[in-house]
UniProtKB/Swiss-Prot annotation:
Belongs to the ClpX chaperone family. The gene is clpX. The keyword Phosphoprotein does not apply. It comes from Parvibaculum lavamentivorans (strain DS-1 / DSM 13023 / NCIMB 13966). The lineage of its organism: Bacteria, Pseudomonadati, Pseudomonadota, Alphaproteobacteria, Hyphomicrobiales. This is ATP-dependent Clp protease ATP-binding subunit ClpX. Residues 3-56 form the ClpX-type ZB domain. GO terms for molecular function: ATP binding; ATP hydrolysis activity; ATP-dependent protein folding chaperone; protein dimerization activity; unfolded protein binding; zinc ion binding.
Amino acid sequence: MSKVSGGDSKNTLYCSFCGKSQHEVRKLIAGPTVFICDECVELCMDIIREENKSSLVKSRDGVPSPQEICGVLDDYVIGQQHAKRVLSVAVHNHYKRLNHAAKNNDVELAKSNILLIGPTGCGKTLLAQTLARILDVPFTMADATTLTEAGYVGEDVENIILKLLQSADYNVERAQRGIVYIDEVDKISRKSDNPSITRDVSGEGVQQALLKIMEGTVASVPPQGGRKHPQQEFLQVDTTNILFICGGAFAGLEKIIGQRGKGAGIGFGAKVQSVEDRRTGDILKDLEPEDLLKFGLIPEFVGRMPVLATLEDLDEEALLTILTQPKNALVKQYERLFEMENVRLTFSEEALRAVSRKAIERKTGARGLRSILESILLDTMFELPTLEGVEEVVISAEVVEGKARPLYIYAERQGDVGTGA
């Protein structure tokens, strides 16, 4: 029985799980000889929810349906329905291909690597991170900007397979069924349209090195990193069944697409629309493989990623939803931070819309929302721990626009009236 007797606290009840008193939590629920607080109940629900998601892959002979995968992505990623469908179908087919290969059928199913293209802050990396939470196959994320050709300072492409091995606890058979996400792949584009006469060790050279592992080869992977321990034995990993997903912002690609589309309208009746009048996501929908070649990807590299998925710009409504709806929503995070100071944080709807508009103006997408909120709340978070009696902080649209200070509402004490500062 979580009850303390003696002194002033003889009637105080405590949670049997976390030990917090009834005064530290919103609700304390009594059971036979035990108590549980609302915070522990929420934690238990989160644990059960995560276990349900991780057991997603147990349905239908171990193959989750595209709708099930897309449903989990919807919990964390706002919008981008087309990209979610592409990823869901690709992962579903990846599972089916693995099961098909295990049955030694006469038809060989080839994998379809994916290239995700979209403006910065639209959710490419978050989609990959969310996939990693729910999949029952080894998953790793790599950064293309750190890769160089073998023999130069930087990471070899084999290090990607090493990370996959580590996520599979060095089980080679499991690693050979995994999924690899390579981020910032646009940063390894060729530095000019023409083949370089000098060594491009972090651009075209990396693309050449990635070709074989993406298509399928037996890679020799040093378990401790090849350059530091040259005498170690190598592990042999077959990359034929590893699914590769590449993502990048490809800044400037919309201009290449726009130049190609300029010749479409001729004559008095032609509709002419400048690239500036269209949003980046809309322009990217007209993407053709030849545009990627002009951007600096080599033909062989583009050919190994047959599935192209473009992501859209996030509009004001999408950014507003990102601020408030997901489990890791920024507004919820800051509300919890203020709760730790026993202060309620309130945003007006107009304030949240002003934050969304500011992110659109900066062209930083969802990634820029946190920096905007930080700048708005910086002075308040600095002053709050030393202020007494503050019950609520209200953020209005004027505060976001820099025309006013946050409103502080004080608790009434012995007849005093609350004031705003």
